[in-house]
Protein backbone atom coordinates (compact mmCIF):
# COMPACT_ATOMS: atom_id res chain seq x y z
CA UNK A 1 0.00 0.00 0.00
CA UNK A 2 2.77 2.42 0.96
CA UNK A 3 4.55 1.86 -2.35
CA UNK A 4 1.47 2.91 -4.32
CA UNK A 5 0.57 5.88 -2.11
CA UNK A 6 4.08 7.29 -1.56
CA UNK A 7 6.49 5.76 -4.10
CA UNK A 8 10.19 6.02 -3.31
CA UNK A 9 12.41 5.10 -6.26
CA UNK A 10 15.45 4.76 -3.96
CA UNK A 11 13.94 1.58 -2.48
CA UNK A 12 12.73 -0.04 -5.71
CA UNK A 13 15.04 -2.95 -6.38
CA UNK A 14 14.62 -6.22 -8.20
CA UNK A 15 15.03 -9.35 -6.10
CA UNK A 16 17.10 -12.22 -7.45
CA UNK A 17 15.94 -15.82 -7.15
CA UNK A 18 18.76 -16.44 -4.67
CA UNK A 19 17.79 -13.39 -2.63
CA UNK A 20 14.15 -14.46 -2.58
CA UNK A 21 15.11 -17.99 -1.51
CA UNK A 22 17.32 -16.62 1.26
CA UNK A 23 14.53 -14.35 2.51
CA UNK A 24 12.14 -17.31 2.53
CA UNK A 25 14.59 -19.45 4.49
CA UNK A 26 15.18 -16.68 7.01
CA UNK A 27 11.49 -16.22 7.77
CA UNK A 28 10.53 -19.88 7.63
CA UNK A 29 11.16 -22.41 10.35
CA UNK A 30 13.29 -24.58 8.06
CA UNK A 31 16.58 -23.26 9.48
CA UNK A 32 15.22 -21.79 12.69
CA UNK A 33 15.03 -22.96 16.25
CA UNK A 34 12.06 -24.45 18.03
CA UNK A 35 9.27 -21.92 18.27
CA UNK A 36 8.41 -20.44 21.66
CA UNK A 37 4.93 -19.17 22.33
CA UNK A 38 5.05 -15.49 23.23
CA UNK A 39 3.24 -14.39 26.38
CA UNK A 40 0.20 -12.15 26.17
CA UNK A 41 2.16 -9.24 27.66
CA UNK A 42 4.99 -9.69 25.13
CA UNK A 43 2.49 -9.92 22.27
CA UNK A 44 0.73 -6.79 23.54
CA UNK A 45 4.02 -4.90 23.70
CA UNK A 46 5.05 -6.13 20.24
CA UNK A 47 1.68 -5.18 18.73
CA UNK A 48 1.90 -1.71 20.32
CA UNK A 49 5.45 -1.15 19.04
CA UNK A 50 4.50 -2.48 15.60
CA UNK A 51 1.41 -0.29 15.35
CA UNK A 52 3.26 2.84 16.48
CA UNK A 53 6.09 2.00 14.07
CA UNK A 54 3.69 1.65 11.14
CA UNK A 55 2.00 4.95 12.01
CA UNK A 56 5.34 6.78 12.31
CA UNK A 57 6.70 5.23 9.11
CA UNK A 58 3.57 5.92 7.05
CA UNK A 59 3.14 9.46 8.40
CA UNK A 60 6.81 10.28 7.72
CA UNK A 61 6.74 8.79 4.23
CA UNK A 62 3.49 10.60 3.42
CA UNK A 63 4.81 13.89 4.76
CA UNK A 64 8.10 13.51 2.90
CA UNK A 65 6.43 12.52 -0.38
CA UNK A 66 3.90 15.36 -0.46
CA UNK A 67 6.17 18.04 0.98
CA UNK A 68 8.94 17.34 -1.53
CA UNK A 69 6.41 17.06 -4.35
CA UNK A 70 5.44 20.70 -3.87
CA UNK A 71 8.43 22.23 -2.07
CA UNK A 72 12.00 21.01 -2.50
CA UNK A 73 14.38 21.46 0.41
CA UNK A 74 14.88 20.49 4.01
CA UNK A 75 11.73 19.28 5.77
CA UNK A 76 11.58 20.75 9.27
CA UNK A 77 7.90 20.38 10.16
CA UNK A 78 5.72 17.57 11.50
CA UNK A 79 7.65 14.49 12.58
CA UNK A 80 10.80 15.91 11.01
CA UNK A 81 10.69 18.75 13.54
CA UNK A 82 11.82 16.28 16.22
CA UNK A 83 13.59 13.46 14.34
CA UNK A 84 15.67 13.71 11.17
CA UNK A 85 14.75 10.19 9.99
CA UNK A 86 11.33 9.23 11.39
CA UNK A 87 10.66 6.80 8.54
CA UNK A 88 13.68 4.72 9.58
CA UNK A 89 12.60 4.87 13.23
CA UNK A 90 9.19 3.51 12.23
CA UNK A 91 10.73 0.66 10.27
CA UNK A 92 13.11 -0.19 13.10
CA UNK A 93 10.16 -0.35 15.50
CA UNK A 94 8.15 -2.48 13.09
CA UNK A 95 10.90 -5.08 12.58
CA UNK A 96 11.83 -5.03 16.27
CA UNK A 97 8.29 -6.10 17.09
CA UNK A 98 8.65 -9.17 14.87
CA UNK A 99 11.98 -10.07 16.46
CA UNK A 100 10.51 -9.69 19.95
CA UNK A 101 7.81 -12.24 19.21
CA UNK A 102 10.29 -14.84 17.95
CA UNK A 103 12.33 -14.65 21.18
CA UNK A 104 15.60 -15.74 19.61
CA UNK A 105 18.91 -14.04 18.83
CA UNK A 106 18.91 -14.86 15.09
CA UNK A 107 16.32 -12.20 14.08
CA UNK A 108 18.19 -9.59 16.15
CA UNK A 109 21.46 -10.51 14.43
CA UNK A 110 19.83 -10.20 11.00
CA UNK A 111 18.22 -6.90 11.98
CA UNK A 112 21.51 -5.54 13.32
CA UNK A 113 23.12 -6.37 9.98
CA UNK A 114 20.29 -4.62 8.07
CA UNK A 115 20.20 -1.63 10.41
CA UNK A 116 23.96 -1.09 10.25
CA UNK A 117 24.64 -2.31 6.71
CA UNK A 118 21.63 -0.72 5.01
CA UNK A 119 19.78 1.78 7.20
CA UNK A 120 22.78 3.49 8.80
CA UNK A 121 24.60 3.78 5.48
CA UNK A 122 21.50 5.31 3.85
CA UNK A 123 20.97 7.64 6.81
CA UNK A 124 24.57 8.88 6.65
CA UNK A 125 24.31 9.39 2.88
CA UNK A 126 21.07 11.31 3.34
CA UNK A 127 22.61 13.47 6.06
CA UNK A 128 25.58 14.24 3.80
CA UNK A 129 23.12 15.23 1.06
CA UNK A 130 21.02 17.38 3.41
CA UNK A 131 24.12 19.18 4.71
CA UNK A 132 24.12 21.30 1.54
CA UNK A 133 21.17 23.30 2.87
CA UNK A 134 22.10 26.48 4.75
CA UNK A 135 19.75 25.67 7.66
CA UNK A 136 21.19 22.15 8.11
CA UNK A 137 23.57 22.86 11.01
CA UNK A 138 20.87 24.52 13.12
CA UNK A 139 18.34 21.81 12.24
CA UNK A 140 20.82 19.06 13.17
CA UNK A 141 21.47 20.70 16.57
CA UNK A 142 17.75 20.69 17.41
CA UNK A 143 16.83 17.19 16.21
CA UNK A 144 17.88 13.65 16.94
CA UNK A 145 18.84 11.23 14.22
CA UNK A 146 16.30 8.58 15.28
CA UNK A 147 15.21 9.63 18.77
CA UNK A 148 14.00 13.16 19.65
CA UNK A 149 16.47 15.33 21.55
CA UNK A 150 15.11 16.23 24.95
CA UNK A 151 17.58 19.01 25.73
Question: Could you say what each language-model-derived stretch is?
Answer:
Residues 31-151:
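Hydrophobic transmembrane alpha-helices
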Amino acid sequence: MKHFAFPDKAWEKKVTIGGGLMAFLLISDVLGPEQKIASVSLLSLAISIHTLGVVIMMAADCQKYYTLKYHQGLIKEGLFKYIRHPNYLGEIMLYSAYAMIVQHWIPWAILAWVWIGVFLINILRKEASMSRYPEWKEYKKKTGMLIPKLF
